[in-house]
Design a protein with these regions (language model features):
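Conserved serine/cysteine hydrolase catalytic core
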Residues: 8-85, 90-93
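Non-transmembrane alpha-helical segments in soluble domains
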Residues: 1-3, 21, 34, 38, ...
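Catalytic active-site module of serine/aspartate enzymes centered on a nucleophile-bearing elbow/loop
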Residues: 88-121
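Short secondary-structure boundary segments
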Residues: 3-12, 119
């Protein structure tokens, strides 16, 4: 719960908690989750290094959102980081911790819907 703004599970209803628990209840789920993080630190990182060296950027419009009570807000600036990787990026912090959808769905939708409306083709 330390990843939530309130440092507890109050943002999660019981159905959501049950869903999370179900997905972390078996060795296979835990293994898959660990492999996802492992790939991010190895294969994905290696591909990112090559792309960055070749000055390749994400070409589609990109929306970057982060919780203002989370680690990204403690860095130099999440949006500035994404500008290095994207041709067109916009975004801002949302009053939440790591779990934006659960902690502040109203502000998440207020950011997502206009972005998607502007870029729907």
């Amino acid at each position: 719960a330390s990843w939530t703004k309130a440092s507890d599970l109050s943002a999660f209803n019981e159905d959501a908690l049950s869903e999370y628990r179900m997905h972390y209840a078996t060795p296979e789920h835990i293994h898959a989750t660990c492999n996802d993080y492992r790939a991010g630190a190895t294969y994905d990182l290696a591909a990112d290094v090559v792309d960055h060296a070749a000055q390749r950027k994400i070409a589609c419009p990109t929306l970057a959102l982060w919780g203002t009570a989370g680690i990204p807000s403690e860095t130099e600036g999440p949006l500035e980081t994404w500008h290095e990787w994207c041709d067109s990026v916009e975004g801002h912090g949302i009053d939440s911790g790591h779990f934006i959808a659960e902690e502040n769905p109203k502000d998440l939708l207020a950011a997502l819907i206009p972005f998607l409306d502007r870029h729907a083709h």
